[in-house]
Amino acid sequence: MGRVRTKTIKRASKLLIEKHYPRLTNDFDTNKRTCDKLAKIPSKRLRNKIAGFCTHLMRRIANGPVRGISYKLQEEEREKRDNYVPQESAIKTNEVKIDRDVEEMLKSTLEFPTIPQIHVVDQKRYNKNTKKSNK
């Protein structure tokens, strides 16, 4: 079973990733040296634990967004996705096909005006008695 990480280690790692994301990598040794330069960590053992958890989180971030950690690159990607407007609409309203029953219903209830995009199509009725042969 793995070792339990304290709140201090998790908090410190989270802050380091949020503030210095581009400097950290998936390699423990480089993260250890980076943590040493960026923060004043009182002991070697604590520094190694923080660097190890940073490495763990960086590997998780590579797979996808991690809950509780927000860094600038991730926020920019999220904004791009939210503000994306397609060139052509997915819902094309060039032509809408309706059958005679729907047309009558629209005219009677809504006093529906004639719109050029709406085309009335004869609907073929489904016959229950016809059977398909399996030949």
Swiss-Prot record:
InterPro entries: Ribosomal_eS17, Ribosomal_eS17_CS, Ribosomal_eS17_sf
A GO BP entry: translation
Alphabetical UniProt keywords: Ribonucleoprotein, Ribosomal protein
Domain of life: Eukaryota
GO CC annotations on file: cytosol; ribonucleoprotein complex; ribosome
SUPFAM superfamilies, per database record: Rps17e-like
Pfam families the UniProt entry points to: Ribosomal_S17e (PF00833)
Family, as annotated: Belongs to the eukaryotic ribosomal protein eS17 family.
HAMAP family for this protein: Ribosomal_eS17
Protein name: Small ribosomal subunit protein eS17
Source organism of the structure: Dictyostelium discoideum (Social amoeba)
Molecular function terms, GO-annotated: structural constituent of ribosome
Manganese in keyword set: no
